[in-house]
Design a protein with these regions (language model features):
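Conserved subregion of the PPM/PP2C metallophosphatase catalytic domain
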Residues: 1-16, 20-187
């Protein structure tokens, strides 16, 4: 989704549980991320300020659009813990802000499967989890990471529904097979 001119928000999440309750929580997580990132505005509603739960490295511009957007992860965590903590619902989440001009991707991986950067030779990089899941720990610190995605590269994010799927013979698909699929495709 578009955040500001030249910045795109990229998000994928997987809520714990199954069924209607889990689906409703996923809708809540989605709405909170979009509202707190500034993608959606609510007339007359004051949003909370910075939580200081997204660490900003001193050498970076902490007032940049990406940092404000990434703060949405911490604000979502705070909201879920305070208002729904007794339900023990949480989500793994990958949220990134892509500067479409430079290819810079600033992201938080909150316990989600590693996103993959795929180039002409196959898998170039795994974007490993850097932070805890969202909605479980009241004082969680979310650590942003930064990479540059080269022109022509593919960013692939997925849920464990891909790697946990089974063949008709009950064979697990797994992470290794997923990596092999992309290495074979690009060679």
């Amino acid at each position: 989704f578009e955040l500001s001119e030249g910045n795109m928000g990229l998000v994928i999440a997987d809520v714990c549980g199954k069924g209607v309750g889990a689906a409703l929580f996923m809708a809540l997580f989605r709405s909170l991320i979009r509202i707190f990132s500034g993608q959606t505005s609510l007339e007359g509603v004051e949003l909370p300020g910075k939580t200081e739960m997204v660490e900003c490295i001193a050498s970076e511009n902490c007032d940049a659009d990406y940092h404000r957007a990434l703060e949405a992860v911490s604000l979502t965590n705070k909201y879920i813990v305070q208002n729904h903590g007794d339900l023990s619902m949480f989500a793994t989440l990958f949220f990134g802000v892509l500067d479409t001009a430079s290819g810079k991707l600033s992201y938080i991986n909150a316990g989600h499967d590693s996103a993959l950067v795929i180039g002409p030779q196959g898998v170039k990089q795994r974007l490993e989890p850097s932070s805890p899941v969202v909605g479980a720990l009241p004082e969680a610190i979310y650590l942003p990471r930064h990479i540059v995605i080269d022109s022509g590269d593919i960013l692939l994010a997925f849920t464990d529904g891909v790697t946990d799927s089974r063949s008709p013979g009950d064979e697990l698909f797994g992470h290794q097979r997923l990596h092999h699929l992309f290495d074979e495709t690009f060679h």
